[in-house]
């Protein structure tokens, strides 16, 4: 366990629309409200979102070394936009995706004229973070905007004459017209969100007088088939279910300092492929989405101790969170794997909970929140992608 401010943990999974008990109506309604589209359009979009990966793998190969960005437009209809460096004839494609039961046409729009590739731009994120940190002490997030082709830096601070002068100095020093640098002043800070079905609400003692709340994530297993329940490493080591008192015993963790936030616990409960999306409602995990398959504009949902079930939109993939320990100077949340989700619904004790897409596809484990220091309002959250589970020898229980 690591920090008192961390978010609760949940369990996520993939989806199968053919099974009515897998929550299609719940996600369709959420998508419709989130993007302002009809329920019919929402249903169509979720089907496309669940079946698009192979089509986009083909796009990645076709334009290898030239892609400036790939993102999702959710309204008025679902489509994929691919920005390509260099010259060419813009085009619109419809690619059949789906399964043996049903297929749909995935709209893909190819736009030429990008000035820089995504790979080269992401290779400049640390440079941008270091430059901004020369002028500001509270840089929160640095990422690449795949829609605009610019690098964005979000800094905790107010709009003042002095801060504007610093922003102008940073941009002058950056001076790269092919890769613009945008500095945004924000009123929030990035913090861990702490306050055997996945999504179980749990609490564990962290001192003689204090307990921390979290949420469990997904059922996982190692190469030998031994099953564990996952959560965030910054959550308590040992904890109990707040519902029935089931104990979860610490086995191991890979903390922030090792560019992760993964913990696994054993329990007397039967660990399955189920995860909660409501007080008594579960879904069945059917697959996972990797970091490379995650797109800006994706709709993702989470379930947590503090806020229950809610959905948001991915606004950054592979972002960095350049916060440093004021005493040692060590990075608090190292790594360039974080996925940034735009939502107003998150809170302490959501840490460790499941983040999922297309009903039952696991996206990752919820870890950090962008929290207003005055009001406590959520301005978004960051999750650890499924890659960080699999690269350490674990896999989901399907």
Name every feature range the model reports, one short phrase each.
Residues 186-398:
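Terminal interaction modules at protein C-ends
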Residues 22, 49-53, 161, 288-294, ...:
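Soluble non-cytosolic domains of exported or imported proteins
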Residues 65, 75-79, 105, 148, ...:
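Extracytoplasmic
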Residues 37, 41-44, 112-133, 137-144, ...:
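Protease-domain processing segments flanking chymotrypsin-fold serine proteases, especially trypsin-like
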Residues 22, 29-34, 43-44, 52, ...:
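Short glycine/threonine-rich beta-strand-turn micro-motifs
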Residues 81, 109, 180-184, 313:
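Ser/Thr- (and often Asn-) enriched beta-sheet segments in non-cytosolic proteins
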Residues 1-18:
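Gram-negative bacterial Sec-dependent N-terminal signal peptides
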Residues 62, 99-104, 131, 169-173, ...:
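Structured segments of extracytoplasmic/periplasmic soluble domains
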């Amino acid at each position: 366990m690591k920090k008192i401010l961390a978010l609760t943990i949940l369990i996520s999974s993939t989806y199968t629309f053919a099974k009515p008990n897998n929550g299609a109506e719940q996600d369709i309604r959420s998508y419709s409200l989130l993007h302002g589209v009809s329920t019919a359009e929402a249903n169509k979009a979720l089907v496309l979102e669940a079946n698009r990966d192979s089509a986009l793998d083909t796009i990645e190969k076709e334009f290898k070394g030239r892609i400036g960005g790939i993102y999702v437009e959710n309204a008025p209809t679902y489509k994929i936009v691919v920005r390509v460096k260099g010259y060419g004839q813009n085009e619109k494609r419809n690619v059949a995706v789906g399964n043996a039961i049903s297929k749909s046409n995935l709209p893909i729009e190819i736009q030429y004229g990008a000035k820089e590739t995504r790979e080269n731009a992401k290779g400049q994120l640390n440079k941008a973070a270091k430059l901004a940190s020369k002028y500001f002490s509270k840089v929160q997030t640095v990422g690449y905007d795949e829609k605009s082709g610019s690098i964005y830096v979000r800094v905790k601070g107010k709009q003042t004459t002095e801060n504007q002068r610093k922003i102008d100095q940073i941009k002058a020093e950056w001076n790269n017209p092919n890769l613009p640098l945008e500095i945004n002043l924000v009123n929030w800070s990035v913090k861990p969100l702490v306050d055997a079905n996945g999504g179980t609400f749990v609490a564990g003692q962290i001192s003689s007088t204090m307990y921390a709340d979290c949420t469990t994530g997904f059922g996982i297993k190692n190469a030998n088939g031994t099953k564990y329940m996952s959560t965030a490493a910054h959550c308590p080591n040992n904890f109990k279910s707040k519902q029935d008192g089931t104990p979860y015993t610490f086995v191991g963790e890979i903390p922030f300092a090792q560019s992760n936030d993964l913990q696994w616990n054993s329990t007397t409960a039967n660990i399955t492929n189920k995860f909660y999306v409501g007080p008594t409602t579960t879904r069945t995990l059917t697959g996972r989405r990797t970091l490379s398959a995650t797109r800006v504009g994706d709709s993702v949902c989470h379930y947590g101790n503090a806020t229950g079930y809610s959905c948001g939109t991915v606004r950054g993939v592979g972002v960095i969170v350049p916060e440093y320990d004021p005493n040692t100077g060590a990075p608090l949340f190292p790594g360039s794997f974080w996925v940034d989700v735009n939502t107003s619904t998150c809170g302490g004790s959501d840490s460790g909970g499941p983040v999922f897409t297309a009903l039952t596809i696991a996206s990752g484990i919820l870890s950090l929140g962008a929290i207003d220091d005055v009001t406590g309002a959520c301005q978004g959250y960051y999750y650890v992608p499924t890659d960080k589970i699999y690269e350490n020898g674990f896999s989901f229980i399907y």
